[in-house]
Amino acid sequence: MSAKLPSPDRRKILAASAAVAASRFIPTQARAASASSDAIRSFKVDVPEAELTDLRRRISATRWPEQETVADDSQGVPLAMMQELARYWATDYDWRKCEAKLNALPQFITEIDGLDIHFIHVRSKHENALPMIVTHGWPGSVIEQLKIIDPLTNPAAYGASASDAFHLVIPSMPGYGFSGKPTATGWNPAHIARAWVVLMKRLGYSQFVFAGRGLGRSHYKCDG
């Protein structure tokens, strides 16, 4: 696997610009939340087998609509494709394998603004690595980022320079994966961006860069 990594000069520019952006993100309320509830708890995924069995049963019991009347996808996802996906999810997909991959990584939960936030935190072996927070999109989860962790934290193993290394923080957005579900409105991109700043400072990163796609990228546009 190869990864295109920024040059050291580009990393300096990214670090400088992101540090300025991060400092503008921290309101008084966010600082108070960080001071009053900053515990970081280890986390492991352990989905009960009964829940997996029930999910497979419900997938297998899907009541399918009539087949589309065209040979393309102009009427939506073709019935045959959805039926094949459902068959795979119900019979072939190995959740435990995915669970093991997640549990092989350092996972944590911390409370920010009253909401539990799940995240993966992988530090590079290179102490001068650049901290980066990476956010998944919609629909999506932290699983999207699993393949980039090793190339970005250990670039020398992929033919790049150790100076291109990153410390990675990969959170689950509120309401996604193993993060808590908001009970009220207000967790918009700007709020999530402020929460990510609190998270990074809680982990000891006063300066950092950020990356995301789709909805995950919109959080970082909030600083203009």
Language-model segments: what does each one mean?
Residues 60-107:
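An N-terminal hydrophobic leader/cap segment in hydrolases
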Residues 31-38, 75-78, 104, 111:
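Alpha-helical solenoid repeat scaffolds of the TPR/TPR-like class and their adjacent stem/linker regions
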Residues 26-52:
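C-terminal segment of N-terminal export signals and the immediately downstream linker at the start
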Residues 89-93, 98-224:
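Catalytic cores of eukaryotic secretory-pathway lumenal/extracellular enzymes that build
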